[in-house]
């Protein structure tokens, strides 16, 4: 029986980056790993309303660098940067080394699988009809420029006594094409009828240059056509004969 591999795990080193970049000895490896899990749980709990998608952790020698990808950077930074300074001090205590926090703004939340899944889960917890929540998320993502999206819900949908799985897809979602930029996330919605699993796959196009374009993104320059002058603009010749 065939099983689906994790869409991001199979693309690591091909078109996807790791969320943790550090090297450690066998003795330190487990300590760093547990510390990373604690830091991520702490940040997601403390910044629950900041719409955090990813938390990248790097550990250069004698320091720590944490990059938070969020759709609401103002909540993380706070007034005059007070919140982010306080956050850096707390993370320094947790990690035991000076911690630097960087903010990466997500300009298109509808193209981020984790934020879309969190949005669907919050709607289910507010007792919104699950089919309406699925279709609304799919339409918003396709309107924002996604090439394809698939949403899958599992559990006691609509309060049914028997759990089942339903999914909705629009566009293309090529899971076996390694150059395809597939974003994936799975979250849980805690409803009055029990836990409902939410999975989201978003196809955002193909990455042809591999990791070069991932580590060195080049912004496409928008070339505008020259403006055409109307008949009333420009220099006029004086044709009046007096």
From Swiss-Prot:
CDD domains: KH-II_30S_S3 (cd02412). Disulfide bonds: none annotated. Residues 218-242 are annotated as: Disordered. Part of the 30S ribosomal subunit. Forms a tight complex with proteins S10 and S14. Binds the lower part of the 30S subunit head. Binds mRNA in the 70S ribosome, positioning it for translation. This is Small ribosomal subunit protein uS3. Belongs to the universal ribosomal protein uS3 family. InterPro entries: KH_dom, KH_dom-like_a/b, KH_dom_type_2, KH_sf_prok-type, Ribosomal_S3_C_sf, Ribosomal_uS3_bac-typ, Ribosomal_uS3_C, Ribosomal_uS3_CS. GO terms for molecular function: mRNA binding; rRNA binding; structural constituent of ribosome. GO terms for cellular component: cytosolic small ribosomal subunit. Transmembrane segments: none annotated. Keywords: Ribonucleoprotein, Ribosomal protein, RNA-binding, rRNA-binding. It holds the Pfam family KH_2. PROSITE patterns: KH_TYPE_2 (PS50823), RIBOSOMAL_S3 (PS00548). GO terms for biological process: translation. Residues 39-107 form the KH type-2 domain.
